[in-house]
Regions:
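Structured-RNA-binding interfaces characteristic of tRNA pseudouridine synthases
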Residues: 1-245
Length: 245
């Protein structure tokens, strides 16, 4: 039995997240169907993590086991003929049996995209959070440093969710603007459910003047979701990269 690592890009617009669900289209379902067809046996994929409905991935990582040798250099081309056009395998690599896409991941980077629009943008609605008001980018950038480091991010998950360990480390958080588009990029050792979208919403509130940058440490220390910005839309979120040793 051999283990293979796939890097997968997908447009999450028409899927109910990554994880397989009964009677609902998901990315995992489409991947497993394609792989099972290719190898003529049931294949299960194990992702670096689950993405929610509407969330995209530039480079999701999964692994699977199969008792066949794969020509990795051309596997992406062949398997993509069995996948829908909104999912693509961009690389294939044979790995050791000890490799695990989820438990071996050391860093993940997410990208959140915001479009500053005066009117609704039909062409960007599936790929950006649409923002109809001006934002102070300098203040948003100033707030980033308060998120970096190891903190208990309990405030940055939904209030009705339970999680034993809510301590995470953010290695880098940045805000950049290019014309009418804003890119929030965050790298960490792991993220709570909705954490990136809540951080993005909090930075938007900083940009609107609703939250002062220097108030971020107090919000983190409070461990209460009530002080944060809202959870921004899923369609602006992209899993950009997953790093391993």
């Amino acid at each position: 039995m051999a283990r293979y690592k796939l890097t997968v890009c997908y447009d999450g617009s028409d899927y109910y997240g990554f994880q397989r669900q009964n009677n609902l289209p998901t990315v995992q379902q489409k991947l497993e169907e394609a792989l099972s067809t290719r190898f003529q046996r049931q294949i299960t994929v194990h992702p670096s993590g689950r993405t929610d409905a509407g969330v995209h991935a530039i480079a999701q990582v999964v692994h699977f086991d199969v008792d066949s040798e794969i020509k990795t250099s051309s596997f992406g081309y062949s398997i993509n003929t069995l996948l829908p056009k909104d999912i693509a395998v961009t690389s294939c690599e044979k790995v050791s049996d000890e490799f695990h896409a989820q438990f071996g991941a050391k860093r993940k980077t997410y990208l959140y995209k915001i479009c500053l629009c005066k009117i609704h943008s039909p062409l960007k609605r599936k790929y950006f959070h649409i923002c109809f008001y001006d934002l102070n980018i300098a203040k948003m950038q100033d707030a980033c440093k308060f998120f970096e480091g190891e903190h208990d991010f309990r405030a940055f998950m939904l209030a009705n969710e339970e999680k034993e360990n809510t301590v995470r480390t953010i290695y880098a958080l940045s805000v950049e603007q290019a014309d009418d588009e804003i890119y929030i990029r965050v790298t960490g050792n792991g993220f709570l459910h909705n954490m990136v979208r809540i951080i993005a919403g909090t930075l938007v509130d900083v940009g609107r003047g609703r939250i002062a940058p220097e108030d971020i440490p107090k919000i983190i220390e409070s461990k209460r979701h009530v002080g944060t910005g809202k959870t921004l839309d899923p369609q602006g979120l992209y899993l950009e990269s997953v790093e391993y040793i």
